[in-house]
Amino acid sequence: MSETKIRTLQGVVVSNKMDKSIVVLIERRVKHPMYGKYMTRSTKLKAHDETNVCNEGDLVTITEVAPISKSKNWKLVDVITKA
């Protein structure tokens, strides 16, 4: 069988006000199809933080998992740098 690649992303924690949950801002660079200018696009993802170790401004790695709740499909893997 073919192996599926596990999706992991890096981003900055912008909110940790929820219990065992964080909001991670993911930024990516995309090229405009007509004009060729590179633009920054961003996405906010909710992730599960079981031990509540993250604070705002932390650089973290998250991975995609089975749905935990209505809006949480990501889980915290590790904290790269603390704020």
Curated annotation (Swiss-Prot):
Part of the 30S ribosomal subunit. Belongs to the universal ribosomal protein uS17 family. It comes from the Bacteria. One of the primary rRNA binding proteins, it binds specifically to the 5'-end of 16S ribosomal RNA. Pfam families: Ribosomal_S17. Signal peptide: none annotated. The keyword Nucleotidyltransferase does not apply. This is Small ribosomal subunit protein uS17. Keywords: Ribonucleoprotein, Ribosomal protein, RNA-binding, rRNA-binding. One of its GO terms (biological process) is translation. HAMAP family: Ribosomal_uS17_B (MF_01345_B). The keyword Ribonucleoprotein applies. One of its GO terms (molecular function) is rRNA binding. Disulfide bonds: none annotated. GO terms for cellular component: cytosolic small ribosomal subunit.
